[in-house]
Amino acid sequence: MGFLKSLFGVTDDNAADEKKQSTDKDFEILKNDGIRALRQCQCNADYAVKCFEHALAIKDDAEVREQLAVALYQLGEYAQSAEQYGKLVELEPDNAALIMRKAEMAYLADEYDVVTADCARILELQPDNSRACLLYARGYMGNGNDIPAIAMLTKAIALDADNLDAYLLRGQQLLKLGDINGAKEDAEKLVAEAPDSEEAQLLLARVNEALGNHEEASNKYNKVGDLNPFSVEAFRERGAVKLAMGDKEGAEADMRQVLEIAPDTLDGTTGDFTAEGREGIQCKVEQAYKNINPLGL
């Protein structure tokens, strides 16, 4: 048999080469089809995943695996995306950027222990990485560890004074824990740096309400409403402030706005008040606000 193959110019080596060329061609087609699909439209992510998975079945390739991780992220498969980044990190254990992407996917997948472990590793490699400190804090917060989270946010700010996300999270955490003055400092810093930030104005409104400054809180909620006319939090919490100030009509108007934007926001309440008398509406509004703690304290 070997003699006949030799006679007709066919050898085992030639057959192996032809097979390799064929599989290499298939790999490139699958890889390029997947990349093209991702670039064209996020709606093609499912097809791209299939292309990349088939390509990896032919040959392990770091570029294809990273593209697979991106496609899985676009599909909302965060845990699977983190798994793919994890395999890339195994190849480059000191690549802080890859570890960060893995940690970000793990955070989206609610895998907070993975997040904190990955961020700790990043800080070993890059002690001055403020973004890693911020994500580290988010991981702590996900596990309910508020004090370490605040410490890590403070470190993030110390490393980068322009890390406004760290100021926002720290202010929110301080307010949650009852450190209103500390929260106020962060909120005022945020509003000074980013006056058009809805979240910054909302934090300052909540701080003022916690301090009992109803009028100022109401003004800040007005600002949030100007920035985002569909902010359920702004209308709901401003309504609570108005009710505390004795403005039942104003509170009722804000409640109507809440129910118009998000009819299912309040359990046992519908957006249709037309069948009720005015006293019934006010009663419902008051009861609704009694069930709401807008400051989360």
Regions found by a protein language model. Give the residues of each.
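Structural signature of tandem alpha-helical TPR/SEL1-like repeats
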Residues: 41-50, 75-87, 109-121, 142-155, ...
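Helix-start (N-cap) detector for alpha-helical repeat units in TPR-like alpha-solenoids
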Residues: 27, 62-64, 96-97, 112, ...
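Short coil turns that delineate tetratricopeptide repeat
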Residues: 59-60, 93, 127, 161, ...
